[in-house]
Amino acid sequence: GMARTFQNIRLWKSMTVFDNVLIAKHLRRSSNMFTAMFRLNAREEARQRAEVLELLRVVGLEDVKDELATSLPYGKQRRLEIARALATDPTLLLLDEPAAGMNPQETLELAEFIREIREKFHKTVLLIEHHMDLVMDIADRIYVLDFGELIAQGTPAEIQNNERVIDAYLGVAEDAED
């Protein structure tokens, strides 16, 4: 499956960090009304709670697991949103402008975090982002759109030197005599 995050952070603000991630695990729960009524799924619930604790440890949020989502700094809220998406165990993780609103230090930490996700969880990450330094730093392949039209695809080095990309995003130099 696929999980995504949004440009604007979408957390359950009145819930703890732990509960924000646990609720995403409910997508994978095999309970029904009968098993819920008689608490027959207690083992599955205990397993999911343990998985959430492990995920929070891996993403660096274990120490704030009992904090409300709203009490976290912006960078950690973004990390929590990504952890919640990972809790659904997607094959593809879509990150929509994850660096939006971040300061340069948070953006550097985000780049490292995305690399860790790819390595530790073996996930394909589709990144939609306007921070070119971030994109060039972490992407294996880049697809560039100009008003919805694909104008280039390739490695970061190929994209940096692509004339169509340069024209579209830096503008074509006007002839001084015109």
Residue ranges and their predicted role:
Residues 2-178:
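Glycine-rich phosphate-binding loops of nucleotide-dependent enzymes
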